């Protein structure tokens, strides 16, 4: 191969060999070609099986509560041959998985990434402080200093909404939240809040879910209300199989339906 290309691909390193700069570039390009081949093979399999296929989806904890159930229901009705492989986690973890080609798309909050990505908004959301309905702070206006006296369930400091929350306490000269439980996924947090007596910071959409509306309440403080967009993220230039495109289309339609229902509720 070196003779054919006319360039050194390996160099001596002690008793072994290591790649030269040209060798590293060739290796990276080879991996990209290999991934393209596998992607094309998957597409051919999907087409031969009637628009079926596997879509690897990363989903944020909040989206598993208010978006994912409706997405799965619609997919089963429209394209029952599509299979979802779901990873639930925080944005930072999911993005690492996407960069490694472990997942194809992310459904969750749209945040800034260092690597180039495509992002499609699906719906709007607000992150608010929540607690059980019998929490001492429930049902009355409270200050940041009041909340700093109680324990919290929060994600790691690498997660954007945790950084936003800490910044709000810091800028208002209040002690940072006293984190009693640090959690890797917010999917199980609503149940924990209801039983543990701890505060948390989570999607307002979850608080109106039938399962939690009688158990959880938003703590009355307008300073700690973080607006955000929720949508779909994938790597710029990534190949999207027909099955993946269908999941994206269904997710967008579910988001539109949710927004029109929310508007109707406000009008009523």
Task: Give the location of each predicted region.
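Hydrophobic residues within well-ordered alpha-helices
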Residues: 20-23, 57, 97-99, 147, ...
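Central regulatory/effector-binding core of bacterial HTH transcription factors
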Residues: 52-115, 175, 182-183
